[in-house]
Each structure stands twice: as structure tokens, then as C-alpha cells.
A protein has these predicted regions:
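Glycine-enriched, solvent-exposed interface loops adjoining structured elements
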Residues: 1-200
Length: 200
């Protein structure tokens, strides 16, 4: 279902005139519906390990503790690394982590050499100890914050730019979430809609 289709369906169910465009609209009510749908999608995307938002990243290691910004390594809207998915495909070994601050400081207090690497993310950077060998192929899965895909099938985003944008999350949940958010915004009783939504 596209952005335009879900907004039109919502409008029909809510007794609102059906728009012919959403992203090109100047109607404040249509723009509010779009904003509420974006709010719903961004919230729903944080509620678990959605397979539709799972992406694999590959990285060639550098011979330094910091492997660089995680957003540069995992380029499609990085939210977090799925636990126990980083593997050194060159050595065929798992990379342990993420470890916490205390564990990291403990590692830094002793001299270690590979091949059992451990990682953490600090300040938006992927840090590894001991320093890895350059040129190893590492791969991992991460959850993306991008729950929208463009009609081209390759542009991922978390805000709408075109009426033809589609959802990676279930249409029914997005529509249910939009309905209770709209009722709340209008000062109407949304408790029953919210309870039904939360039960899904």
C-alpha cells in the first residue's frame, strides 16, 4: 500500500474528503495526517526486531581501534546491531559484543592479541579490541530506522517524500496507529482504538 492509498483509506473511514495527493497537498488536515502517520511509523519501527527492517552490512577492517562511524559502515539508517551477528568472515570467528563501558575499560587494562575480537559502539564509532588485522571481511545484521521504501525499490527513508512511497511495516498496524493518534490529536476518546492497537 502506498502513502496516498493509506491516507485515502483513512480519510474514507473517518469521513474526511479523500485527497488526490498527500505530499503535494496544501490542506492542513492532509498534512497533519501525513505527520501523524510518520510519527506512528517511526514509533512502530522501534518496537522490536522487524525482519523487514533487518539489513546486512559488510566492513573491511582497519588496523586501528576505531573502525569508523557506524553510520558510515551501516549506511541504511542504522538503529542498532542485532546481538551476536558480527562475524569475521576471514577468520570465521564471531566478534564478541557489544560490551559495556566497564568491560571495555577492563580490556584496555590488559594486553591482548587476536583473534577473539570484542566491540562496542561509543560516540557513534565502532571500536574493536584488540586492534584487528587490516583487510578482514566482517559482516553483521542491523536494524534500520528506515521503514519506508520508495517506488524505485531501492530508496529507504523514515519520512515521506512521494505519494508512491510504500511501507516496510504492516499496513494494518500503521492504519490502526494512525486512527488512534488522529483521535487523540482531535481531543476525542481514543481508548478503545488504542487498546485494540496495543493488543496486536
Amino acid at each position: 500500500m502506498t502513502l496516498l492509498e493509506i491516507v485515502q483509506q483513512f480519510c474514507l473511514r473517518s469521513g474526511i474528503p479523500k485527497p488526490v495527493t498527500v505530499t503535494g497537498s496544501t490542506d492542513t488536515q492532509v498534512l497533519q495526517i501525513q505527520a501523524l502517520l510518520e510519527e506512528e511509523g517511526n514509533d512502530l519501527a522501534t518496537r522490536g526486531d522487524w525482519e523487514a527492517l533487518t539489513i546486512e552490512a559488510n566492513h573491511t577492517t582497519l588496523a586501528t581501534e576505531s573502525q569508523g562511524a557506524i553510520g558510515t559502515i551501516a549506511t541504511n539508517g542504522f538503529r542498532y546491531i542485532k546481538n551476536q551477528t558480527i562475524w569475521d568472515r576471514t577468520d570465521r570467528l564471531p566478534v564478541i559484543g557489544p560490551i559495556n563501558s566497564r568491560q571495555w575499560q577492563g580490556l584496555k587494562s590488559v594486553v591482548l592479541t587476536g583473534p577473539r575480537y570484542q566491540f562496542r559502539i561509543r560516540g557513534g564509532n565502532l571500536l574493536v579490541n584488540p586492534v584487528p588485522v587490516a583487510g578482514h571481511d566482517w559482516a553483521f545484521e542491523y536494524i534500520s530506522k528506515n521503514w519506508i521504501i520508495g517506488a524505485d525499490g531501492i530508496t529507504y527513508k523514515n519520512l515521506f517524500t512521494l505519494d508512491t512511497d510504500e511501507f516496510l511495516l504492516p499496513d494494518t498496524l500503521l492504519l490502526m496507529g494512525l486512527r488512534w493518534r488522529w483521535m487523540r490529536e482531535k481531543g476525542l476518546d481514543y481508548s478503545e482504538l488504542f487498546s485494540t492497537y496495543e493488543a496486536q
